């Protein structure tokens, strides 16, 4: 297929603004320096008689076109127009011909002649004015799309300090929630599309990078050309069991045919600090006797002792180009991100190479792509080890070190450890390596019929090792010496895919068909070992057998291997008539070894319709209306179970051990019951949408309304033993419903030669409801308490109940404090207010629903401004109508504890007369639930395109400064009201152990050569 058939096209209204942003981002369409191997040929060309031609490229309105390609036909000699549409090019001779092209306009050719000034006016190409979006196994003209699909191009990505690809589109796609909720440099974004649909299955959308399944962290953000989101089931059903949570399609940048070699560098440096810290007592308040602490005479800022101003630097270099028959691209990225907490970091090096070659008069195309990533991070799991918690609750009058240089500890207090010692008395290396190789062979024997064979292998290897010294708190408190561990894991996915597609247009008809086969084979294997009580800390993890725990049978050793194949047959037919009526049908038949013997296979169909009302004759008089299209779709998708052998009886050999007559023996125990009827969760979704554009597409948008029902939901049911071998069985029984509305509005309020303002607003609402938890065979209570807090509270904070949504807080409603300093709690049965007693904790007479953790409204607001060489963009996100459990307040806003306290403990709750006394134990009451509403300045970026004189090497430089998480408008008292909500069993809980979110300031540079 010719190169121009595959171009990503822009809508007319966004064309010039997108180009401005494209150029300011330093994306490479600029001329390149001469490669070393071409030096001799350049000398020869210079000796020939050359002609210089210059001029201005404009559109039909007389406005300059920025970034238009000016090429000397038949060569790689060329340039692009500047911000005034001007160009200058030296060509070989007067017989040369210039080819002028730009996306959205007809390509023109003009003879050079004697050179001089040649102004050019490009004409609109109406066939190119409709943007192309990526759908499953192909692309589609936006005007023909009948499903809920959102597309974000590179020029609209969020700039600044970007951790993974999800952050590029945060707040830009209605219904897609992206949150990190953590400052951990190794944390990935949590993504959820259209609510919670499963109790046991995953909630993250399927991510495909150039058609290959992968994670958002497996691709460099700088290398992404577009991100397309398949939101409804009619679009995602062609991916079957993997598409129930939606599909995110990432397309990377590649070289173009007959284009000059272009090179680009982009890099940034960033400084980060905690976005907010909690206000605890300092040493002076301790000396005033406001806690039970003994004054040790020091003044220690524990949080400062374990934190720093974190430095991040990121560098990306890419090169791309192409000849008549070959394209190539390569890029290299290095990134090191420090965490604000000491010894937390993320260091990564990623390389990518892609080459394509056409032969036999474009009948055959061969492509090879390789991605290699090396990742390294430290051994500190700051959240898991409670470093932040230990720092905020520790006595500020205690020292960090003893006089002998060891870390000061006070083991008389439970769960109380020196956070600096936790960091310094351990060492380790966590390395991972990811390799992805993909090959494609595309055969096009006749025009418009393509058959493609794709082979891919993805291998991820993790190699982790670590050591706790004899002074580490867990070893020291239990009278053990050093502890060492070592593990290696490898995850391999082999993928074979064959697709054949055909498209044809005649008269007013359009027809597209696709059939395909996919085979995916996954293998996971690894081993791990640990030992402790070492005579010396010298060897670290390098001599595992030296620890004496091995001789006592207390050392650990394990290995595992599991595999599973996934097979799919799929097809799709799309038909359109007269650019008015469109229909799309798809089906996938899929089989997996993960399911029971009776349900290995399932079928996932979909249908969607589109009616472009604005193209009807009766709409011809409405010149202000550019587009009005009604869409409707229905589809079935599935959720696949995580473990390979859940449908089988599984035995655990080696645990537990038992000791008999001086010898350790391995035991054998049952790990799971068989279930031959185990099958896919099934999600059925109906979506109706409306796309519109007015005023020459200066104002456009979409609205979608949907309802999604999940049936045969997986749940671990308690079963009797005997007759069962194990007390739990994974089975299909539950039902859940999600329904909502999504709105997106795009506008260009101002557009002149020197100034442009673009703005986008997204809004979404989703309502979740659990419909059932049982069936005729498996039954459980319609009310299940969960989301337990840790020691010493140890209470559930939420209740899952049929007929209600997930994330329902459930507990005691407090209304004040008694004169005895105890909570006053509402009795739900009598309505009376009673003083707190321990008997209330498990008595439903004193517990009630207190609010929900799932926001009712999600907002995103994105703005970009361009004034001459300056550009400014900012992004705001918000969530409204939900509750947050402030766990740090529940623990440290209390006068009975043996730890440090929040200063707010001095404030009388509910504006009353009394504060909590030392008699009131830590517990969960409604006082610790807060409104979570917020509006956050997620990112703001100011950029400047540096004017350059004509240069042989550097064509464009853009510098920018950026701030992330700059401020948050909220009434919430905790660190950050933006919850990651990755675990549906603990929604809306602001954990005391979490890694606090950070605020970052960035300076970046983009250079095109």
Describe the residue ranges of each PLM region.
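Glycine-rich, aromatic-lined ligand/substrate-binding cores of catalytic
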Residues: 852-885
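Residues on the lipid-exposed face of transmembrane beta-strands in outer-membrane beta-barrel proteins
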Residues: 252, 282, 317-321, 351-357, ...
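Transmembrane beta-strand segments that form the barrel wall of outer-membrane beta-barrel proteins
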Residues: 265-267, 332-336, 583-592, 634, ...
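Surface-exposed loop/interface segments of Gram-negative outer-membrane beta-barrel transport/assembly proteins
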Residues: 143, 257-298, 340-346, 350-434, ...
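Short, small/polar-rich motifs associated with maturation and membrane association
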Residues: 1-353, 358-359, 364-367, 371-373, ...
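Extended, hydrophobic alpha-helical segments in both membrane/secreted and soluble proteins
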Residues: 224, 351-353, 567-573, 581-591, ...
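Short aromatic-centered micro-motifs
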Residues: 70, 100, 207, 401, ...
